[in-house]
UniProtKB/Swiss-Prot annotation:
Sugar attachment sites: N53, N390
Cell location: Membrane
Binding-site positions, FAD: 405, 412, 416, 457, 461, 484-491, 506, 509
Membrane association type: Single-pass membrane protein
Function: Catalyzes the oxidation of sulfhydryl groups in peptide and protein thiols to disulfides with the reduction of oxygen to hydrogen peroxide. May contribute to disulfide bond formation in a variety of secreted proteins.
Active site: C67, C70
Gene name in the database record: qsox2
Lineage: Eukaryota, Metazoa, Chordata, Craniata, Vertebrata
Domain spans labelled Thioredoxin: 30-155
One matching Pfam family: Evr1_Alr
InterPro entries: ERV/ALR_sulphydryl_oxid_sf (IPR036774), ERV/ALR_sulphydryl_oxidase (IPR017905), QSOX_FAD-bd_dom (IPR040986), QSOX_FAD-bd_sf (IPR042568), QSOX_Trx1 (IPR041269), Sulfhydryl_oxidase (IPR039798), Thioredoxin-like_sf (IPR036249), Thioredoxin_domain (IPR013766)
PROSITE patterns reported for this sequence: ERV_ALR (PS51324), THIOREDOXIN_2 (PS51352)
Domain ERV/ALR sulfhydryl oxidase stretches: 400-509
UniProt-recorded name of the protein: Sulfhydryl oxidase 2
Family: Belongs to the quiescin-sulfhydryl oxidase (QSOX) family.
Length: 661
């Protein structure tokens, strides 16, 4: 307060307001890319305006800021963007973070299910398209990606090539001869190289934004012209000056790295215009450390971490799949069954899982649109007592920056909890396909990660790890310890990696402050007391130890009364509406329910329990409709049978009472 001494009293509120703004600014979410990088940072609103009907092609990286492989690859992608920033009139490099909740719908509409995903978009694209997948035979290193970019540009149709684009095709010997005779107003550099070489085309694109110079490439197929110009080997560069002088450039050893700089340094060669700012109004701001992180007890498991992870799974990761079929559908059904039977959730979440599981069992379909599942998850049928938080709120899984920890941490905690619940509730999976199967949770986790987990490299690592030893698990307790061991293996592998949170280092867990009895020393060598570890894991992930702190049920009830978690927009596919706007999801389940006029949120929330819960037993509108249909059908059937037998009985009476003559 001493800082305010001597200030006019009316100035203090203004200073406090400025202080709040500064604090709010430091708490902004991080992404892997910032305005200092040479990439265009896109979001749900800007991606359509940038990509479609653009005069340049685009190469986009769809990534997730929590994905370890994306974090590791970010420096390479930044270096690529810097390396080809002069190519912007031909192609631009962009990124879109699919971990941002506002971008869920965008990534779904572009069909992104794995991270990172790379897509090419042609110039002058008018209709909505999901782009062309990056196809690299080898790696994703800078040189490889540059060559794939050139192949994409060179094979683009004529209507996707602006007149300003340079020609990447080789010129003929006659064209070379015509360039040697008259004086020209600009420099002409001819790069002789083999047909499979990319260096000449890279230099052409490097000089695309520079005036007073034209760069072409030629093949060494015409021996006489090579002898005439004194070219003895390739690659070589022949420079024709505006004054008519021409000759080989001999002081350049490497075509791409040095020749581009040499040509840019020629007299009167100037850059036409500075590159457009790639991120004006698009970037999220410079990454800063989140100093407002809640203080939490590391010895506790928080329900909000589990429910936030479940929200992300059902509304983001799985929602990226437009339909579920085959092995994906089977995996999803088994995953929901495991959740319904073992998830240590609160009643309203468990009722949602129960409803979802029963609905899936009752659907004898080989293909299910995920929008139908979303309608149920978002409780479009307004079944009372069903809701799931519609946002992520990390507590024990919160990192020092918003792109660290989060969902992967929550997924580990979720499956640790499920393995413990399977052990302490041995009859929970009775009368299911997993009855008496000690590896039920592990195999379901393995299949889920293989089919749905967004980080493809992480999924490959886990699959390789599970393939080796998971079959050795014979009891539920062994399943608990197997997952604990493998989690520590992953922690050891990722220790010191770019994806590691410096405030939460990857260590062998549980640490001695959480469970001193779990650790022992034999001859100065550390070892685990696995009996104590097992007991600790059962306590830590048991129902009694899950903290409901930060999980306010009243807050969740207010969410259920509004939109039940349905807040993700969808992409409008019409060319004239290429922005992300608020639209209702396809109401697959609502087609069976009579539409009601819109009401205020207060009246809607007040009526929801009355209109849905019939006689207190939780019948939905669909249930009531089916009951009415069954009642009417049964009544009609009974009436038909009544008249049928009555008619027959009359015929019998007439026959028996007929007088004999």
């Amino acid at each position: 307060m001493a800082a305010f001494v001597g200030l006019p009293l009316r100035s203090v509120p203004m200073l406090l307001l400025l202080l709040l703004l500064v604090v709010a600014g430091t708490a902004r979410g991080e992404t892997l890319y910032g305005p200092e990088d040479s990439v265009t940072i896109l979001n749900k609103e800007s991606v359509a305006r940038a990509v479609f009907n653009s005069s340049s092609a685009w190469l986009l990286e769809f990534y997730s800021s929590w994905c370890g492989h994306c974090i590791n690859y970010a420096p390479t992608w930044k270096a690529l963007a810097r390396d080809v920033r002069d190519w912007e009139p031909a192609i631009k490099i962009g990124v879109l973070d699919c971990a941002e909740e506002d971008n869920y719908g965008a990534c779904k509409d572009f069909g992104v299910t794995l991270y990172p995903t790379f897509r090419f978009f042609k110039a002058f694209t008018k209709e909505f398209t999901q782009g062309e997948n990056y196809k690299a035979v080898g790696d994703r290193e800078i040189q490889t990606v540059r060559q794939v970019i050139i192949d994409f540009l060179q094979t683009s149709p004529a209507e996707s090539k602006p007149q300003a684009w340079p020609s990447l095709e080789p010129i003929s010997s006659s064209e070379i001869s015509s360039l040697l005779t008259p004086k020209q107003s600009h420099y002409t550099a001819i790069i002789f190289e083999s047909e499979e070489s990319y260096e000449g085309r890279e230099v052409i694109l490097d000089l695309i934004q520079y005036s007073n110079i034209v760069v072409r490439r030629a093949l060494p197929s015409d021996k006489p012209i090579l002898e005439k110009l004194g070219i003895g080997s390739v690659p070589s560069c022949y420079l024709i000056q505006p004054n008519g002088l021409h000759g080989l450039i001999n002081d350049v050893k490497s075509i791409r790295s040095q020749l581009s700089l040499h040509l840019k340094a020629l007299s009167n060669v100037r850059k036409l215009l500075p590159s457009e700012t790639a991120h004006s109004g698009l970037s999220k701001g410079v990454q800063q450390e989140d100093t407002t992180m809640n203080q939490f007890d590391r010895s506790k498991l928080y329900m909000t971490d589990l429910e936030s992870g479940l929200h992300y799974i059902l509304r983001a990761e799985l929602a990226n799949h437009h339909t579920l079929e085959g092995e994906k559908l089977k995996t999803f059904k088994d995953f929901v069954t495991i959740l319904y039977k073992l998830f240590p959730g609160r009643p309203h979440v468990m009722k949602l899982l129960e409803t979802l599981q029963e609905w899936l069992v009752s659907m004898p379909l080989d293909t299910i649109p995920y929008d139908a599942i979303l309608d149920l998850v978002n409780n479009k049928m307004r079944i009372s007592g069903i809701f799931l938080t519609n946002h992520t709120q990390w507590v024990g899984c919160r990192g020092s920056k918003s792109n660290l920890r989060g969902y992967p941490c929550s997924l580990w905690k979720l499956f640790h909890s499920l393995t413990v619940q399977a052990a302490v509730k041995p009859d929970a999976l009775a009368n299911t396909a997993f009855e008496a199967e000690p590896r039920a949770v592990l195999q379901t986790m393995r299949r889920y990660i293989r089919e749905f987990f967004g980080c493809r490299e992480c999924a490959k690592h886990f699959e390789a790890m599970a393939k080796e030893t998971v079959d050795s698990v014979k009891t539920p307790d062994q399943a608990i310890l197997w997952l604990w061991r493998k989690h520590n293996v992953v922690n050891n592998r990722l220790s010191g990696a770019p994806s590691e949170d410096p405030k939460f280092p990857k260590v062998q867990w549980p640490t001695s402050d959480l469970c001193s009895a779990c650790h022992s020393q034999t001859g100065g060598v550390h070892s685990w007391n696995e009996d104590e570890v097992l007991a600790f894991l059962k306590r830590y992930y048991g129902n009694q130890e899950i903290s409901l702190e930060f999980a306010d049920p009243r807050k969740d009830l207010s969410e259920a009364a509004t939109d039940n978690g349905n807040k993700e927009p969808h992409f409008t596919k019409k060319p004239q509406e290429r922005d992300y706007v608020k639209k209702q999801n396809p109401q697959f389940l609502d087609k069976l329910v009579q539409k009601k006029p819109e009401k205020s949120l207060d009246s809607e929330a007040a009526e929801s329990s009355q209109s849905v819960s019939f006689l207190g037993i939780g019948f939905s509108n669909i249930d009531m409709s089916l009951c009415v249909i069954l009642y009417v059908t049964s009544s009609l059937f009974l009436m038909i049978m009544f008249f049928f037998f009555r008619f027959r009985s009359k015929r019998w009476k007439v026959r028996y009472n007929r007088p004999f003559v």
